[in-house]
Amino acid sequence: GKGERLHPLTQYRAKPAVPFGGKYRIIDFTLSNCINSGLRQIAVLIQYKSHSLDRHIRYAWNILTPELGEYIASIPPQQRISEDWYKGTADAVYQNLFLVDNEQPEYLLVLAGDHVYKMDYAEMVNFLVENNADAVVGAIEYPIEEATRFGVIGVDQDHRIQQFDEKPEHPTPMPDDPTQAFLSMGVYLFKTDVARKYLSEDAKRNTKHDFGKNIIPRMIQERRVYAYRFQDKNMKAVKYWRDIGTLDAYWEANMDLVAVDPLFNLYDQTWPIRTYQGQFPPAKFVFAQDYQGGRMGVALDSIACGGCIISGGRVQNSVLSPNVIVQDYAVVRESVIMENVVIGEHVRIRRAIIDKDVIIPPNTEIGFDPEADRSRFTVTDSGIVAISKGMKLDAPIHTSV
């Protein structure tokens, strides 16, 4: 999709290419799951504003061995079947069935590139085989009162899917817990011949050409389709899966990373999250001689990536991408600051998302006056302020540190 709910972060890039967690892109989490699960033939279907995503895949994910038949390849619309672009998630796969035919795999795994979670897809394949299923949908338990925003799965005692409702007004509860609903994670595993049949038939119908709205609901009437209960490799008390399709969800997911014991663990070396490693110097924190006057470069409960210079400013509960500069007496709280942002002297920022290449002039305040913020920036209903990439603010700024 176009990622319109994540605007302005998707103004110049596809949603999976949006920076996340300081040094990553959103798609890195799905691709890391693939590699950690032992998958080695991966096609990334790209369409809208794809340059940034395509470049990231080439730079960050050129890690496999083509001589062994391994690859991660970005595939734009080929127009082999018609002159149409991808008309939906199912149509995107249908238009690229020639790739599947070339490889002739026994199973076809279809994933969303804009979710954050850790999952071993090999375990899902084992589940499909054990249940002699034609298809399996990854599912996670979720409070039933919050499930109306997602695709909800109704299952029997054996987890065979009985119904599939997209954003229902009254979600179906789980059979063993009426306070929980089963949500679709956007993870679909098929026997390849079954997927080919239903995708080909759907292409001839007047539908949305969507897995959740069309393919799966039709399959559960005719085939053995099961829900696979998400086994989280994040290893926390509460399972972690986030669809970060809105600014609020994006901000909240970044804030999940900065606690002393973060909800999502980036530091588990048994399940590494891979990305492009830019050649940046170490982060630097300077000026400690004037603590009483507030001139102290410090970052608390925060992530600061390579190349960052906290030069007499204070950062708290925030995520800083590479090469961010925070100057004297500036204060940044509960914010996501992307690459090459300069934050001037005496600036105050709270609950903001600032995209790349923005210079914040001295004495600017962001996140304190909703009306003033709305006149210049995007502000969500919950008060999160989003500033687009390269936005020019009025006053000049001194960038020496």
Description of each model-found segment:
Residues D193, E201-V401:
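Left-handed beta-helix
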Residues G1-V258, D373-G390, S400-V401:
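Unchanged
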